[in-house]
């Protein structure tokens, strides 16, 4: 039977390195920097219904998980990809039961834009009467993809693609952290880190996945893994123009 350590390291690198708190969270300082509105809402457990809108890999799901770890409310993680009206009704029933006993329910719906208008309508009465606090995550413009009545009851927070320096910081953390490659000797230049970051287009998950692939496919000599620009280009199937 695999040990917990082995099972953990079978997880993809982005999952292993997912931050547990806001101090570890990288980027989105306009929302979660010291004194900013979303940080205050999370730290005071004063969450109201909201939509996280931004491109892939910028921290939407991570912020929801941080909220889950800080709130005293019941937290339900829900995917629009694998759920339908039946599952929505079951969750709403659970939320109603929680409300009877004085417990709030936060419902996180990943890829909420995947729900059609009628499915989104099913949330509306429960949001209106406070049975659930809805947190939706979407890569699509909420004005076009979210029911207007539901959207009017949610605060939209816009998450931006990460800056290259933010990505480089994440990559360095991945190399040094015991949850990443901290137990390995890795030779990788700052130029190579910036190259991976530039290829990621502000997507932290993409950058970390690329780093994992690059390290797993780099040559080892005398116990040291040597990362080159060539292997990065091979793994990403992209050619560097800025770093030649």
Functional labels for PLM-detected ranges:
Residues 1-10, 40-79, 93-96, 124-129:
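Walker A/P-loop
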Residues 153, 169-182, 216-217:
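Conserved AAA+ ATPase "sensor/coupling" helix adjacent to the nucleotide-binding pocket
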